[in-house]
């Protein structure tokens, strides 16, 4: 059934726009250039407002997810990477449940990736229609059918651009992937902005600067009681404070420390005697994939809940999914869940909130740990990184595990890889929860994604430099 399903959508995949694989080896300088161009296009799209919208000043239902999904409200990047990640989530779940089967051949992998791209485009159109029809840009009846269609087309074209930019980097023209690049850029931009923002906000305490560090100097300069000013800079409410900034730095350090945890399996050449090496299995075996997929799941739950609560407010089943409230304290107007599944799947706002509602905190912790472990373990089956796939790669390189026959390699690898994937996903979820409870800037999930992505780029940079030989020796 699985192969039949992929064969059915094969004709549609053939007409999709595609980036051709490079016919030659792309030099490191060219990769840096293409990566910079990709990032520039993304940042430009983040600043171009959607044409035809009447208003985007209403409470933002996806405020908490925008940093993670690299989206910017009221611009071409309204949807961000959400369609790509959602399509990946759907295809992974279908493959993990064996509803569709992905073979080991390059043809089957290419067909699977094509199906993922097709779903990405369909989801882009679907999300664009939902955003317009739920009144995020104004009442659809007031805007008219023509303007509504124009906004949907703009969002679809922008979504297609994101898909192609991601594919451009994935095919080897640039460094890393578009998804990782866009997420890391968005999160780092948020952290820097909340640390140094010169924007002033009117609070009950008077006019204050949004940026935590600028607020520190402003409070020390304007307040006569310096101790109280210092305390306010560290613990002020509803705006970024120095404790949030210190928590962010602390989480950065903890995640980088855990990145070094790994088990080295001894391997040897089956062809040349005396040639030994190691195969590393990292603690974060699936890297940040679990948290990206978990974010996609929650964001789509938010979309569905918001759409239903707008149309069917007061319905019991709709309220069971999520009830929402608006707030504008300490920043732009935003909607946040106050009941239902969406509430329990959202992080507590602070450590004080944990003490006020421990049941919420307990359910959130269980959800984060369970979903990250599940996504991590199922991802290895569809990404070519399971024990069977690793054994096949080692066999192709004529390498075997020391002390084991070639036929028993899969069994031995199965002792480590699924465990590393599940436990690594569990740790990723745990670190995200810890960062949320500490009040790190950009949410625990966002910080975790930023650190793992930056570390990935560091590893890519080291690898590229080492391949350049003498240049690598000079730099490292």
UniProtKB/Swiss-Prot annotation:
Bilayer disposition of the protein: Multi-pass membrane protein
Disulfide partners: none
UniProt subcellular location: Endoplasmic reticulum membrane
Transmembrane intervals: 34-53, 77-96, 118-138, 145-165, 173-193, 241-261, 289-309, 355-375, 421-441, 446-462
Lumenal topological intervals: 54-76, 139-144, 194-240, 310-354, 442-445
Topological domain ranges for the Cytoplasmic compartment: 2-33, 97-117, 166-172, 262-288, 376-420, 463-476
InterPro entries: SecY/SEC61-alpha (IPR002208), SecY_CS (IPR030659), SecY_dom_sf (IPR023201), Translocon_Sec61/SecY_plug_dom (IPR019561)
Entry keywords, A to Z: Endoplasmic reticulum, Membrane, Protein transport, Translocation, Transmembrane, Transmembrane helix, Transport
GO biological process: protein transport
Entry superkingdom: Eukaryota
GO cellular component assignments: endoplasmic reticulum membrane
UniProt subunit comment: The SEC61 channel-forming translocon complex consists of channel-forming core components SEC61A1, SEC61B and SEC61G and different auxiliary components such as SEC62 and SEC63.
Function: Component of SEC61 channel-forming translocon complex that mediates transport of signal peptide-containing precursor polypeptides across the endoplasmic reticulum (ER). Forms a ribosome receptor and a gated pore in the ER membrane, both functions required for cotranslational translocation of nascent polypeptides.
Annotated family: Belongs to the SecY/SEC61-alpha family.
Protein name: Protein transport protein Sec61 subunit alpha isoform B
Organism this protein belongs to: Oncorhynchus mykiss
């Amino acid at each position: 059934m699985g192969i039949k399903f992929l064969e059915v959508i094969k004709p549609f995949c053939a007409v999709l726009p595609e980036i051709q694989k490079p016919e030659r080896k792309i030099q490191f300088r060219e990769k840096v250039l293409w990566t910079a161009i990709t990032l520039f296009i993304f940042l430009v799209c983040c600043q171009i407002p959607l044409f035809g919208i009447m208003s985007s000043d209403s409470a933002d239902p996806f405020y908490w997810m925008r940093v993670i999904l690299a989206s910017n409200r009221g611009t071409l990047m309204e949807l961000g990477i959400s369609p790509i990640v959602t399509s990946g989530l759907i295809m992974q779940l279908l493959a993990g449940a064996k509803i569709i089967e992905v073979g080991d051949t390059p043809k089957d992998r290419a067909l699977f990736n094509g199906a993922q791209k097709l779903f990405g485009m369909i989801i882009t159109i679907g999300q664009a229609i939902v955003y317009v029809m739920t009144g995020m840009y104004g009442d659809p009846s007031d805007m008219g059918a023509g303007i509504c269609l124009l906004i949907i087309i703009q969002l679809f074209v922008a979504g297609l651009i994101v898909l192609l930019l991601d594919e451009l980097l994935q095919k080897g023209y640039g460094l890393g992937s578009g998804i990782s690049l866009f997420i890391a850029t968005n999160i780092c931009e948020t952290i820097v902005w909340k640390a140094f923002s010169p924007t002033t906000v009117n609070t009950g305490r008077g006019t204050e600067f949004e940026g935590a560090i600028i607020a520190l100097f402003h409070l020390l300069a304007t307040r006569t009681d310096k101790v109280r000013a210092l305390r306010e800079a560290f613990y002020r409410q509803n705006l970024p404070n120095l404790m949030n900034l210190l928590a962010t730095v602390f989480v950065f350090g903890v995640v980088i420390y855990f990145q070094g945890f790994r088990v080295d399996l001894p391997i040897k050449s089956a062809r040349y005697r005396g040639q030994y090496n190691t195969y590393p299995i990292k603690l974060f075996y699936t890297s940040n994939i679990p948290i990206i997929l978990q974010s996609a799941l929650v964001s789509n739950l938010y979309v569905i809940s918001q759409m239903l609560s707008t149309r069917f407010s007061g319905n019991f089943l709709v309220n069971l999914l999520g009830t929402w409230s608006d707030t504008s304290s300490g920043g732009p107007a935003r909607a946040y869940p106050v009941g239902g599944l969406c509430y329990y799947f959202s992080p507590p706002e602070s450590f004080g909130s944990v003490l006020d509602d421990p049941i919420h905190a307990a359910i959130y912790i269980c959800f984060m740990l369970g979903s990250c472990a599940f996504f991590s373990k199922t991802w290895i089956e569809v990404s070519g990184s399971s024990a069977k796939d690793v054994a096949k790669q080692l066999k192709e390189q004529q390498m075997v595990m020391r002390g084991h026959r070639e036929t028993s390699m899969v069994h031995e690898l199965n002792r480590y890889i699924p465990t590393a994937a599940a436990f690594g996903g569990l740790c990723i979820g745990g670190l995200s929860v810890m960062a949320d409870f500490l009040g790190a800037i950009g949410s625990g999930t966002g910080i975790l994604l930023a650190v793992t992505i930056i570390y990935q780029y560091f590893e890519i940079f080291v690898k590229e430099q080492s391949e350049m030989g003498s240049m690598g020796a000079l730099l490292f």
